[in-house]
Amino acid sequence: MSATDPLLLSESKEVQERFSQMLRETLEAIFNSFSDGSAFSGIDPYELRAKINDLGFLPEEGKGFEKVLEETEKVILPHMLRTWSTEYMPHLHSPVLTETICSELIISCFNSSLDSWDQGPAATEMEVSMINGLVKLFGFPEDTSDGCFTSGGSQSNISAIIAARDWYCAKKFNYDVKMDGLPPEYSKLRVYTSEISHFSMDKASHILGMGYRAVRKIPVDSKCRIDVKEFAKMLEEDVAAGLYPYCAVATFGSTDFGSIDDAKSMRELCDKYGMHLHADAAYGSGLIMSQKYRDRISAISLCDSITVDFHKMFLLPISCSAILVKDKDLLKCFELHADYLNREEDEEDGYINLVGKSMQTTRRFDALKVFMAFQTRGVKGYGEIIDKAVGNASYFYERISADPEFIAPVEPELSSVVFALNSGDEVNKKVRRKLLSEGTVIGQTVKDGRVMLKFTLLNPNLEHSKIDAIIVRIKELGRTFS
């Protein structure tokens, strides 16, 4: 190690000064990559692949930080997606609040791990504090509820399905899956979710050994919400056939349409059949911050568990998610004790070891990002961000639904709008690809067998004038390719 190449952070003023210089140089490289506002350089994937491969993998002798940063600035940064651009709107992939970028630096510098108290004292206590606040925020009872941060919505959803499976088998069959493996009735267990729900439900069923066929896909209505009558019919038929419905998933914001299922009616059916009700609110949970739109997810407190993604509407860096449970015992399915990590006597002496609540062992201090964002913005500031996103989606929908050149099949409840030019599938595909080459990135999906385009509007800096300009450009390209 030398002053020009500090190996680790330390108390040394020389090291701190050099590291500060490295940070300044890195920021300069980032800012130099900023363009005229476009979201993407438009580079061809084959050209970009060749440029990246030319950088090499592992040199015999290190190049030093300056050289590596120079290559990064030249080859990589110009072709990064600029998520803060108002021309980036394809996915639930948000720009990030500036204070949370600073929180990521703190997280990386200290490199805390959330599995045991002695690997992250302040980090552990902060996560516990934030979880306690979150369960209250979403209407769960403070004395019985719990949760933990996860790597993303998929892990949160899978964790919920595992917990529901173990809970149901204990209640229905007096069977301990954690100790004894799968019960004889396992092949007859069924989970119910919307036909347009997130694919992590299928992934969870595969991981649990039940397979995709154990996931019953409920048809949706014209607003892309679960058809409750079809759900009730499906449950009745499955029980009559000797199957065991153990869990249902209410989607609070479908990926494409932002649709919100009728969780109140689903709760009634789950109570009737003794089922766990999970809320996949990875997308729609952000509405909890909005006085104007909060009522749209008011039924979320009726669910037994909730997935919250902070790297979507909350505008936090990837990744940051949490699973919340109304009954803290649900998370005991992940609890194991290791002599070197989470000794039982530690808990008795006040040392909290969070490894017993999670599928993961090593976990990042993601709660700090939520803390810094919440404290910086407050309910009012966050409410303005959420209201802007939902309002922009409503504005865009009103514009295109009144335009005969477009179709817009579903009125948005959140901030995503699915639409298409009336010119046919190939035209819509070409329009999206051409926009990408120009630096404007929008989404593409399918509805009823038809290729659709998609705006996912999360950026609070997006103004109506920009929306209008993109509409004009889409129409121009549509006429060109027709």
Label every model-predicted segment.
Residues 143-144, 186, 410-415, 446-452:
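Short Gly/Ser/Thr- and Asp/Glu-enriched loop/turn motifs at secondary-structure junctions
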Residues 134-166, 216-219:
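Short loop-beta-helix segment that forms the pyridoxal 5′-phosphate
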Residues 254, 273, 298-401:
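Active-site C-terminal subdomain of aminotransferase-like
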Residues 101, 122, 156, 163-332:
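Conserved PLP-enzyme active-site core in the AAT-like
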Residues 2-144, 456, 462, 473-474:
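N-terminal entrance/gating region of PLP-dependent enzymes' catalytic architecture
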Residues 407-434:
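Conserved PLP-binding catalytic core of the aspartate aminotransferase-like
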Residues 273, 447-482:
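PLP-dependent enzyme catalytic core of the Aspartate aminotransferase-like
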